[in-house]
């Protein structure tokens, strides 16, 4: 059997075939072993048969009745087995024919869909051409009427493409009339009014026709071929009714494939009517004949196998009889042999029965599956027919719009009323495409829509006076998509949902009856479910199919007639069975004789002996081949069912998206009917509304097109977009409302690439995302591409609350910069296997910034590598600001973040969640780069910051009065981690960046918790101490006066520390007004404590200049204000800070062998800055570490060992 899996088959199916072959190899070895065992049993049976014949030869009268009874039972058993085998062969033949017919029909439907897409694309391009302004070389005197006529012609062509082939003859008259209408509509208006054409009554009657019968043909003359198949538990009755003109031989060939009814049926009848549809042709008939020819050799093979099995069964029965007779006469010498033979015989029968039951259950399952798919295809055909009828009605209505109004039919109808009629037809089309079970929910919506149509046909003065609102319920109900896209045609029909799930090594099938029925009916429905079998090899595939009441009385009558015809055939088969049984008996006797002669080495019968043994071996091989062939057929059916299921799933998704697009188009048409309101019109005219309609049509085409057509349609979409922009350029276009994406669709997607972080202004760059998932590692690459290749910026992942911030920014700039407090969600979790990092950087960028971003994330096994590179910013806007007026500086409110409280009992891996808040002002565009490495048990973090260039002179020429910015520092509470057993818990670094007009420094905190260490971080904000109050409200250039914090280092208590690695932090040069960094590093290696403190030369003038520095600062501010008023170029502010008093940590340790010191290094800073100081400490292998920052004090504690990093920035005056 050759099965075509359709266009969706892939390499996965091939891998499944290989897996099945691998699984069948052990079964082959097992079958070989069973063959050897059976061979031994056969030898014993032959001996038993010989003894039985000898007993019969000597005419033992005492066992004559027993022999007759045994032969009678043997005859009955053979008859039942033959009937069962014939029934299974017929069922397989029937399913093969059914699968081939379904495959051909699916191919034709795909071709129709492709042609329909091409026609819809042509229609869309024509509508786009209507929107574009007329050019001198393309107008050619055509007016709007002629273009609409061309559009109607394309719509007629689309209808023809969607219609079946055999409808062309019936629609010839309709096409001729349509062509005449088009010609009349394209003529001048004077000629049209002179020659008024009548609308044919036939077309109006066809619009009102609705087909209630779900199985009726599309047209009265269209032939149908109905297949009525009834499946019972052990009986299959199939009726093939050919309603076409054909010869008697063809009908007889169709009937020949029908099976013989079985007598043991016990389940309720499950009827299925299969409509071959109008798409079948003579090619399908040829395929059926070819299948019949191929099946004839298989029938001969089955007969031969039956003969062999009959001989084997007779031998087994004789052996059983001999064993019973020997047991009766108590032959002690062969008692053990008799018991073993009986036990083996019982086991053999049980295994064979179990195998037959398993195969029967699998066949029953596939029967149900094919049955449900056939019903679903029938319902889809009915939906297609109804859609064609509705499209024909809509086409006729459009033709009526093109025809000139007649005095007897106009009756005061204007364009508004005709549009209302079109909306009604569109609503009817949407109802046809929607499932039937939504009709009850949409009744209120339909009533409201009817009222709107009546209101829209009223005069415009009345409409403006009584403005109607669209109810929210109707909009919500329009967005509802029914998961059961294959419901019955009417809402009163019941639904039967069959949920079948295929797993790797088992098949679970469930039949759910969703109607009110008795318990017996539900139990009968469940009885057809199969037992889980071990031969399934496909992956998890879920399928929901619907069963509808499709049977009829005519099909039942056909079944009875076929049964009457098959009774003579059954009698003939029984007679053949009796003849074969007699031949089998003679063959068995010959086999017994041959074995006995071989035992006594009779040379005269040597040839006969060899032939009998050869036949025995051939029988075993044929049986094994038959089993393998059945397994192959089952596998092919499984592959076919899975491919059809994938195709149906994709079609359902396309249908759902098409319904959503049709709902949007219907709402747009309803908006055209509503009266124009003063706050919504905004200068919109008919051309702009048509442009919006074309956009919705393009969206519908994209939804209906398959995924592989996206690349082909890119150029078409670009041209369409350009045409829409050109057509809407002369007019004022309204702001388009962004559509909300439903949460269900976002949850179903594994990776959702949304455009929520698009550029706020035209200067923002484009970003491309490339994500690769592998088996045990995740490599994520975020590549930032833009016009400026030199600069890179961090990836912006906008949170959900960004829209609120954007709305606040649109209202206007906020004068003071106040910081808000926001608490992150608490994440309680008991068991996490792997928690991967999430980088969230909410950007707040101004229009003058041009930044680009690139981030690389990699998580491999136990390694996490994260790089954040924020490119520097160019100052190209300085010259523009000289020409423009003084713009107010935006004041933003930063969030105070409270880290999540993580409650966790067992965490295997908890990776970091870095969050960065970036806020840049007009004059500050720093370059920032961060690199996170979490590799095995190490955490590295580096912060690199470039120099911040400031062009204050240019800004102060245009903005003499620079407002001072007052900021409140962020209060950050680091996450409290409560954990019993942590394998690896990586840190959660959080960086807050806020740069005012003169530039603020960075703050960084790094901590790590490795193996079984517990980390607690406490961040203390910077404390500003400005003793002097600002006298003036707006000095030209504020000078900052800061006092450094006094930091007291904690005591470190440790008994045994082998190694403690700390995280270094690098500090680079800062501009004049920026605060410096301080870094400290601690190292203890092997039981050694290294402490190095390098203090630069501290001039003794520091203490004396403390108080004088404050006074001088106030004087310099006043002096700078006066100078700024004169020349508007104040000097750069100098920062005067107070030195920090540092208490060195007290280290208590029992066993410290060595203490290594690390020399400190000094970095040169600009004129107003002092030296940097760095202290370096290191601990290794049972670590103690502590981190304290000037801006952010962070404490880290670990379970048995601690990790400490101390960061401190100190300014030493020279």
UniProtKB/Swiss-Prot annotation:
Tissue and organ expression note: Widely expressed. The only tissue which shows a weak expression is kidney.
InterPro entries, sorted: NBPF (IPR055306), Olduvai_dom (IPR010630)
Domain Olduvai: 165-259, 436-530, 707-799, 800-888, 891-946, 947-1038, 1041-1114, 1116-1214
Any single Gene Ontology cellular-component annotation: cytoplasm
Location of this chain's protein in the cell: Cytoplasm
Pfam families: Olduvai (PF06758)
Domain of life: Eukaryota
Basic residues compositional bias, start-end: 1102-1121
Coiled coil region boundaries: 70-128, 292-399, 610-670
Keywords for the protein's UniProt record, in alphabetical order: Coiled coil, Cytoplasm, Repeat
Disulfide cysteine pairs (residue numbers): none
Region of interest: Disordered: 162-200, 433-471, 722-746, 791-837, 1102-1136
Biased composition (Acidic residues): 165-177, 436-448, 801-810, 821-833
Main location: cytoplasm
Stretches with biased composition (Basic and acidic residues): 190-200, 461-471
Additional remarks: Encoded by one of the numerous copies of NBPF genes clustered in the p36, p12 and q21 region of the chromosome 1.
Classification via PANTHER family: NEUROBLASTOMA BREAKPOINT FAMILY MEMBER 1-RELATED (PTHR14199:SF35), NEUROBLASTOMA BREAKPOINT FAMILY MEMBER 6-LIKE PROTEIN (PTHR14199)
Protein family according to the UniProt entry: Belongs to the NBPF family.
Protein name per the record: NBPF family member NBPF1
Native source organism of the sequence: Homo sapiens
């Amino acid at each position: 059997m050759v099965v075509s899996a359709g266009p969706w088959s892939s390499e996965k199916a091939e891998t499944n075939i290989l897996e099945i072959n691998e699984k069948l190899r052990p079964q082959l070895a097992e079958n070989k072993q069973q063959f050897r065992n059976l061979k031994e049993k056969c030898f014993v049976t032959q001996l038993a048969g010989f003894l039985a014949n000898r007993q019969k030869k000597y005419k033992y009268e005492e066992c004559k009745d027993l022999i007759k009874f045994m032969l009678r039972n043997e005859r009955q058993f053979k008859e039942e087995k033959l009937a069962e085998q014939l029934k299974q062969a017929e069922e397989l033949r029937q399913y093969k024919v059914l699968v081939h017919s379904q495959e051909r029909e699916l191919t034709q439907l795909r071709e129709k869909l492709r042609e329909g897409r091409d026609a819809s694309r042509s229609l869309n391009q024509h509508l786009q051409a209507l929107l574009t302004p007329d050019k001198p070389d393309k107008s050619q005197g055509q007016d709007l009427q002629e273009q609409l006529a061309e559009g109607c012609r394309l719509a007629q062509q689309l209808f023809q493409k969607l219609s079946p082939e055999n409808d062309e003859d019936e629609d010839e008259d309709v096409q001729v009339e349509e062509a005449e209408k088009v010609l009349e509509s394209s003529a001048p208006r004077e000629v049209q009014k002179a020659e008024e054409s009548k609308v044919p009554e036939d077309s109006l009657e066809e619009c009102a026709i609705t087909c209630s019968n779900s199985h009726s043909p599309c047209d009265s003359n269209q032939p149908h071929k109905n297949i009525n198949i009834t499946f019972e538990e052990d009986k299959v009755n199939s009726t093939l009714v050919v309603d076409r003109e054909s010869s008697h031989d063809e009908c007889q060939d169709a009937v020949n494939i029908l099976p013989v009814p079985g007598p043991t049926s016990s389940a309720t009848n499950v009827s299925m009517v299969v409509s071959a549809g109008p798409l079948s042709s003579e090619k399908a008939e040829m395929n059926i004949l070819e299948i019949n020819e191929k099946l004839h050799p298989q029938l001969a093979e089955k007969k031969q196998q039956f003969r062999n099995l009959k001989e084997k069964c007779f031998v087994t029965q004789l052996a059983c009889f001999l064993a019973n007779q020997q047991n009766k006469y108590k032959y002690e010498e062969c008692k053990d042999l008799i018991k073993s033979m009986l036990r083996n015989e019982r086991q053999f029968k049980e295994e064979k029965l179990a195998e037959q039951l398993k195969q029967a259950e699998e066949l029953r399952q596939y029967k149900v599956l094919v049955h449900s798919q056939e019903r679903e295809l029938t319902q889809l055909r009915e939906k297609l027919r109804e859609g064609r009828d509705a499209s024909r009605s809509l086409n006729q209505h459009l033709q009526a719009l093109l025809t000139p109004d007649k005095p007897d039919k106009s009756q005061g109808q204007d364009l508004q009323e005709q549009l209302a009629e079109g909306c009604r037809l569109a609503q009817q089309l949407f109802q046809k495409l929607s499932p039937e079970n939504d009709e009850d929910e949409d009744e209120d919506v339909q009533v409201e829509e009817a009222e709107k149509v009546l209101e829209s046909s009223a005069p415009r003065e009345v409409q403006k006076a009584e403005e109607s609102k669209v109810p929210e319920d109707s909009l919500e109900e329009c967005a509802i998509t029914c998961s059961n896209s294959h419901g019955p045609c009417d809402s009163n029909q019941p639904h039967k949902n069959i949920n079948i799930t295929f797993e790797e090594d088992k098949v679970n099938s469930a039949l759910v009856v969703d109607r009110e029925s008795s318990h017996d009916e539900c139990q009968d429905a469940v009885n057809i479910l199969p037992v889980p079998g071990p031969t399934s090899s496909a992956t998890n595939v879920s399928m929901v199919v619907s069963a509808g009441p499709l049977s009829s009385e005519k099909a039942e009558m056909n079944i009875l007639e076929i049964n009457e015809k098959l009774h003579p055939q059954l009698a003939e088969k029984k007679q053949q069975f009796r003849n074969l049984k007699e031949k089998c008996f003679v063959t068995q006797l010959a086999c017994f004789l041959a074995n006995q002669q071989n035992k006594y080495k009779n040379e005269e019968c040597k040839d006969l002996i060899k032939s009998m043994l050869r036949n025995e071996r051939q029988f075993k091989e044929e049986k094994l081949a038959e089993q393998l062939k059945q397994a192959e057929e089952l596998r092919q059916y499984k592959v076919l069912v899975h491919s059809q299921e994938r195709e149906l799933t994709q079609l359902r998704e396309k249908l759902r998206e098409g319904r959503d697009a049709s709902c949007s188009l219907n709402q747009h048409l309803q908006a055209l009917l509503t009266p124009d309101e003063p706050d919504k019109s905004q200068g919109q005219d008919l051309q702009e509304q048509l442009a919006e309609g074309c956009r919705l049509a393009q969206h519908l085409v994209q939804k209906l097109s398959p995924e592989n057509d996206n690349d082909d349609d890119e150029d078409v979409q670009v041209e369409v977009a350009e045409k829409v922009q050109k057509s809407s350029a002369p007019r004022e276009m309204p702001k388009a409302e962004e559509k909300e994406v439903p949460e269900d669709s976002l949850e179903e997607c594994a990776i959702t690439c949304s455009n929520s972080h698009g550029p706020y202004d035209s200067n923002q760059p484009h970003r491309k995302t490339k994500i690769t998932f592998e088996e045990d590692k995740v490599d994520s690459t975020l590549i930032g591409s833009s016009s400026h290749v030199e600069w890179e910026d961090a990836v912006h992942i906008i949170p959900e609350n960004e829209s609120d911030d954007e709305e606040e920014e649109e209202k206007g700039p906020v004068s003071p910069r106040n910081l808000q407090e926001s608490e992150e969600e608490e994440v309680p979790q008991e068991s996490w296997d792997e928690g991967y990092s999430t980088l969230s950087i909410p950007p707040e960028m101004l229009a003058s910034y041009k930044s680009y971003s690139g981030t690389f994330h990699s998580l491999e096994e136990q390694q996490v590598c994260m790089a954040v590179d924020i490119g520097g910013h160019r100052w190209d806007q300085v010259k523009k600001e000289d020409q423009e007026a003084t713009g107010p500086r935006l004041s933003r409110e930063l969030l105070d973040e409270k880290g999540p409280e993580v409650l966790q009992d067992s965490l295997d891996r908890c990776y970091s969640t870095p969050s960065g808040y970036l806020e840049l002002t007009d004059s500050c565009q720093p370059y920032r780069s961060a690199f996170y490495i979490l590799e095995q048990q190490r955490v590295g973090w580096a912060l690199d910051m470039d120099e911040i260039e400031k062009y204050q002179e240019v800004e102060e020429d245009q903005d003499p009065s620079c407002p001072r910015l007052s900021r409140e520092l962020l209060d950050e509470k680091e996450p409290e981690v409560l954990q019993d057993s942590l394998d690896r818990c990586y840190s959660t670094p959080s960086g807050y960046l806020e740069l005012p007009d003169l530039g603020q420094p960075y703050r960084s905190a790094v901590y790590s918790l490795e193996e079984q260490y517990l980390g607690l971080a406490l961040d203390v904000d910077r404390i500003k101490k400005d003793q002097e109050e600002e006298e003036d409200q707006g000095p030209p250039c504020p000078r900052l006066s800061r006092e450094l914090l006094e930091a007291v280092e904690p005591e470190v208590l440790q008994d045994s520390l082998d190694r403690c690695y700390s995280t270094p932090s690098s500090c680079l040069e800062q501009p004049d007004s920026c605060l410096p960094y301080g870094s400290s590093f601690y190292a203890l290696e092997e039981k050694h404590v290294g402490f190095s403190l390098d203090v630069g030369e501290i001039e003794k003038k520091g203490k004396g200049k403390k108080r004088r520095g404050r006074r001088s600062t106030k004087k310099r501010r006043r002096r700078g204000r006066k100078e700024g008023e004169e020349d508007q170029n104040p000097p750069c502010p100098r920062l005067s800070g107070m030195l920090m008093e540092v208490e060195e940590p007290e280290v208590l340790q029992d066993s410290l062998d060595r203490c290594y010191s690390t020399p400190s290094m000094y970095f040169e800073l600009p004129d107003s800055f002092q030296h940097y100081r760095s202290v370096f400490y290191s601990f290794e292998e049972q670590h103690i570490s502590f981190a304290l920052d000037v801006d952010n004090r962070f404490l880290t504690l670990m379970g048995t060992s601690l990790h400490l990093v101390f960061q401190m920035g100190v300014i030493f005056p020279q």
